[in-house]
Amino acid sequence: STNTALHLPAIANEAGIRLPITLFDELSARTPHISYMNPSGPYTMSDLDAAGGIPAIIKRARMLFSNEMTCSGMTIHEIADSAFIYRDDVIRPLDDPVHTTGGITVLYGNIAPDGAIVKSAGVSDDMLSSTGTARVFNSENDAMHAILSGNIKEGHVVVVRYEGPKGGPGMPEMLAPTSALSGMGLKVPLITDGRFSGGTRGAAIGHISPEAAEGGPLGLLLDGDRITIDIPNHQLTAHVTDDELVARKATWKPPEKDLSGYLKRYAASVSSAIEGAILRAP
């Protein structure tokens, strides 16, 4: 799940450790993808269990694990030694993986100067690189209404903004619009400063930073802008000149939200998604 790139930096921050988003990109580039699980692939957790389960995964990737004692009374290496792999198609050998790289890719560009995240393992080959026309929405609900009303077509790029840590506030998961697009058979990318569930499939790009509510370029996009998504080359680009973005920024105002209490305090204190959406000390 792309939430890994949100929660691990936040946990590390509590220990005084900085875990940069670039590290996820570096590790993914050299980590083979060995189990093609639903919703990205054809296999379910029942298939994985029948193929040997987590002990079989540990056996495949034994070199990653130290020999610590577990609550089972066996060490990790003892679990690996006692495991069986019953289906090589479900738990692939390291030298014959589903993909040679891992499931997460970090994108950059004039829409996401600080970065954005996509679960690249869940993107079909024909959607890894595309250019489309922006359909811009200032909330998940507005995007859902447009999708369910039949106003989104292939060739569009759905832009959902003001759903980030500050803008939501709280960075909700955009599972509903991506599920609707998939269920309607639409191969349409969705980009957002919100986040996604592990159940998301397709070209769903989230965690765009800086988010729209902080004045990020995502908030400057207009209907009709052309957007290029190039996952293999880590690019997310709007075909809008720098001068035009500066001109738009001069008249930009975030939508007002009637916040009070904890949500207002949270929105004022939370960092960007790329930093783990952590609460800054006052």
Question: What does each model-identified segment do?
Answer:
Residues 1-211, 216-282:
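Catalytic or ion-coupling anion/metal-binding cores of large enzyme and transporter domains
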